[in-house]
Amino acid sequence: MAKTYKAKLMTDTKVRTGKVRLSYPHLFEKYDKSDKYQCQLIIDKDDRDTLSCIKKAIENAKADGKSSKWGGKIPGGLRNPLNDGDAMDEGGEVYENAYYINAKSNRKPQVVDLDRDDIFDPEEVYAGCYVRATIVFFPYDNSGAGVGVLLNNVQKLEEGERLGGGAASADEDFQDDEDDDLMG
């Protein structure tokens, strides 16, 4: 039986997700365009535990923003970090029946395996693998108002089909070389 990874609301605004799919990972080096470490987490709509924790943390961040940033009220047009994958025009099937969030950090996240040993090889943690992450939701009021997502740490749980048509390995490309006797 496959192990399940239960989501947890660790503080009012900090969530440890259940099993989610990793996309657009920039975990070992900062992404050039934003100068931040970042990734996208794709959450199955059937993962009620993770979604419940995330929604609660978002509400708590809104309450914090109402009192600390937004002058006692929640502004109209508030940006919500939880996005519906089914509403995307060009998301592909990976976003069907899923939500996604984008998480960023100025600090490099710790990336670990199932035994909580550090992972140093960026090839080991790729778009399409399954992870759980700790993320923190916070209110902001610069360039508009909304709730942002801070990326804390990532734990790789299992392999998954690479997203974006990742390159084949040299082993795969050259495995049948012995069978190709062109001079033959």
Task: Give each language-model segment a name.
Residues 1-100:
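OB-fold ssDNA-binding interfaces and closely related basic DNA-contact patches used
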Residues 11, 83-88, 112, 170-180:
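Intrinsic disorder/low-complexity signal
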Residues 18, 30, 49-51, 109-111, ...:
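Residues in flexible loops and secondary-structure boundaries
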Residues 38-40, 110, 155, 175:
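Residue-identity detector for glutamine
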Residues 40-42, 102-104, 155-157:
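Residues in well-ordered beta-strands of folded domains
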Residues 64-143:
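Structured, beta-strand-rich domain cores
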Residues 117-184:
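Compact mixed alphabeta submodule
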